[in-house]
């Protein structure tokens, strides 16, 4: 195998490994729900939006014929659906959960209908779907920024997951390089905010380490 082929294979494997590692961080929430039989301190919307994101990128991967995208997002969609079903099972407010799920599913179905029925040209469909996936992914990476102000205000990183931050950093970096290698801006660009937000979170962990977090809470009590 040529050097370029080895590099591409290694990069593809890195994307799969790091992304599945990021998705698997939700397993701790799943175990918490099973152990406590409740959804206390667990947010539902990230599961739902990540599932929609996975299904969108899965469609892009199928249309593009990219096996790496197909594998990663197929497994991701299955895991996120599992988290959603568990949340629905243990949540006492099932009506709100079902309403949010139905709303995003309706949007997803409308999107599929538009891309597959009203955009017959394959290249135009690929570009428009790639643009949609990129914008959706960027919005997901930037949405937690509002929480960062609260972290600075409280001087506490309790609401942040260190393992998820590391996984997101490696995941975003590997996909950015992968997209650059393929010369696909729809893959490269949306992962750059993921690198940026992960570095910001790591900076907050350095500024407000867990030990300081505990001392600060003791002073507050």
Curated annotation (Swiss-Prot):
The keyword Ligase does not apply. Disulfide bonds: none annotated. GO terms for molecular function: glucoside transmembrane transporter activity; sugar transmembrane transporter activity. Residues 10-94, 127-212 form the MtN3/slv domain. The lineage of its organism: Eukaryota, Metazoa, Chordata, Craniata, Vertebrata. Residues 149-221 are annotated as: Mediates interaction with TRPV2. It comes from the Eukaryota. Keywords: Cell membrane, Golgi apparatus, Membrane, Repeat, Sugar transport, Transmembrane, Transmembrane helix, Transport. Signal peptide: none annotated. The chain crosses the membrane at residues 3-23, 43-63, 68-88, 102-122, 129-149, 160-180, 186-206. Belongs to the SWEET sugar transporter family. Induction: Up-regulated in mammary gland during lactation. The gene is Slc50a1. Interacts with TRPV2; the interaction probably occurs intracellularly and depends on TRPV2 N-glycosylation. It is found in: Golgi apparatus membrane; Cell membrane. Expressed at high levels in lung, placenta, spleen and thymus, at intermediate levels in brain, heart, kidney and testis, and at low levels in bone marrow, liver and lymph node. Within the thymus expression is highest in non-lymphoid cells. The keyword Membrane applies. GO terms for cellular component: Golgi membrane; plasma membrane. It is a multi-pass membrane protein. Mediates sugar transport across membranes. May regulate the expression of RAG1 a gene involved in V(D)J recombination. It holds the Pfam family MtN3_slv. This is Sugar transporter SWEET1.
